[in-house]
């Protein structure tokens, strides 16, 4: 495996300006990650914050032991008992097969940054992956793309109702059939069967979406000591209770702080990354597996979509009795994260950078500073056949990843075609339209009905000429089908379905080609430069 660096900035203006050290964007954050002393400063600031390390370590250790490949993760959890220890953290929804590749790249960034800062700071730094198990939109996590007859389709586990991922039971038989279809869609290699058996075993151990996600992530990072944490697991709710209590007490302040920061961000030209109603209390209440948004109007708390209201005292009483019924939204989840963990750095994708820019005043209202936000790595992987073809064509990887290969494909085909199909057809249409005009004019003079008929007649003539044009082009394409398929194969890797590979493909597709040591090999290459898009040559 070889890694090259490409310059390919994110499309988001906020993320781009953040990477480029632009003051307009950096002013929305407490720390400037471009400063060489940023992590020393953060470490110093963390000494002033209290954390219940024993309770946190105990809960995390118990959670790791639920999964098959937990040994290295459990060793890392022990470090958290050290009062000097800190964490590098990031998270994602519990996607099937760990979801799109950016999840893997986020975890790789967490591991690499934790190792780097443990050496630099001389204190234990634990890599933690926060699984957003309280998310309830299963349609965002219950499918992966598979390829069939050269076309992509979404392969989904159908869900009849909305439930949070930590409680959404996975039918073992349904999951096994779903998994078999995924592997049948892959090209068979020496790795396919053992990989299938391993993933099938991990799936068999899993009862929920988050279980399956954690089993697979811990297996993939089994040598790296990545610690997993499910924010939707009831066992962690007792730890979270005091933060929920504070957020309920400060609801009005949090609402105002968030609204103020969103307005400032919009005025600075960065739009509104989070759009919600002013009454949103930025908390959810879970009942019978369904999640209801809590609204606050200044007097009472109300469950959105359910005719149920609480006073502040009643809601706090529910929290005391049933902390497992409460969960965070996108605004308060970062606050909960930094309240539970001594966060040295938060690893973020481009979208997260945008929405974290709305949270500075929210953190301050809760008595905290925002942790430093570090962009995750970005990458595109290419197999050897595509590498060889690309070298022959001398195309730009940056251009292909950013824009696809359609322009190059059509240009190449035009160069190979000695027949001026477009020119001849356009000239014929112009000439025939000119010859047809007297008929059309005469018909319109005779009456409305003949006039309409003449227009329809011309439409039929033109459509037949266009039909002939398409058929001639199709015949030419069939003549060069073998070479054109190489363009399609390259684009399938570099811009699948018009998306960045990391936003479309899943890790099993790569492991099927290179084996299940792909992640340790990737980590050994220390690919953690900010603002770089890595080209990974498999």
UniProtKB/Swiss-Prot annotation:
InterPro entries: Bacillithiol_biosynth_BshC, CC_BshC, Rossmann-like_BshC. It is an enzyme of class 6 (ligase). Keywords: Ligase. Its EC number is 6.-.-.-. One of its GO terms (molecular function) is ligase activity. Belongs to the BshC family. Involved in bacillithiol (BSH) biosynthesis. May catalyze the last step of the pathway, the addition of cysteine to glucosamine malate (GlcN-Mal) to generate BSH. This is Putative cysteine ligase BshC. It comes from Halalkalibacterium halodurans (strain ATCC BAA-125 / DSM 18197 / FERM 7344 / JCM 9153 / C-125). The gene is bshC.
